[in-house]
Amino acid sequence: MLTFIGLGLFDEYDISLKGLEAVREADLVYAEFYTSCLMGTNPEKMEKLYGKKVHLLSREDVEQQPDWLDKAKDKNVAFLTGGDTMVSTTHVDLRLRAEKLGIETHLIHGASIASAVSGLTGLQNYRFGKSASIPYPYESRRGAIIISETPYDTIKQNSELGLHTMIFLDIDKDKGYMTANHALELLLEVEKRRGEGIMERAVAVGIARAGSEKPVVKADYAESLKDFDFGNPLHILVVPGKLHFLEAEALVKLAAGPGKIMEETE
């Protein structure tokens, strides 16, 4: 059997009691932290709490050559992930592969950044549209620096519908954790190129270290927010669409947003 266990948002103590019990009962415990990771802990602390050895998997181990998956045919295997265990399509794909191999799968959910963002910002969860991810720029074969415009397009589409956009930020083994500041700079660079006024007038909300004792939540106009010090990772970014008056009040009072947004509500 293969049990997918979501570990929550920040440290080893965010795991549910049901999840902890499943880890302790497992024959083998694997974890991947390239789609998301817990910044408030490390494998040693996790192993101490669980009383189990945690085997760390690379992207290749999970997506290309999951040889370890065969062990779940006759053993009780736990697979640990940050956040909720089925938010990433990588994990859905892994579950489907396991089922095709005749391996029984089971899910134990964990706290998700999607629900945490709504709670921390006061933005209503049913008013979110399609989410986006901002990757690091890369250099083309001709030496040009390529910035993805897909996140900008997603924000534009959601904005036209009055919906909020949650933006996940890149985690790269060489470049590290993308900050909300860098993400805003990239969006504003695309704005500069295209001149459509999407980010020029947009309010944005940055969240850092959700799930910790002292998360940072700050709202402001994008041009100003890019200079705010969010501190250590992980960061996530939200670009709200049309704000309900309660959402605007929440951003002002809970995220130190500019009072002017109270005048721009529906």
From Swiss-Prot:
Keywords: Methyltransferase, S-adenosyl-L-methionine, Transferase. S-adenosyl-L-methionine binds at residues 9, 84, 87, 112-113, 169, 210, 235. It catalyses: 2-[(3S)-amino-3-carboxypropyl]-L-histidyl-[translation elongation factor 2] + 3 S-adenosyl-L-methionine = diphthine-[translation elongation factor 2] + 3 S-adenosyl-L-homocysteine + 3 H(+). It is an enzyme of class 2 (transferase). One of its GO terms (biological process) is protein histidyl modification to diphthamide. One of its GO terms (molecular function) is diphthine synthase activity. Signal peptide: none annotated. The keyword DNA-binding does not apply. S-adenosyl-L-methionine-dependent methyltransferase that catalyzes the trimethylation of the amino group of the modified target histidine residue in translation elongation factor 2 (EF-2), to form an intermediate called diphthine. The three successive methylation reactions represent the second step of diphthamide biosynthesis. NCBIfam families: dph5. Belongs to the diphthine synthase family. This is Diphthine synthase. It comes from Methanosarcina acetivorans (strain ATCC 35395 / DSM 2834 / JCM 12185 / C2A).
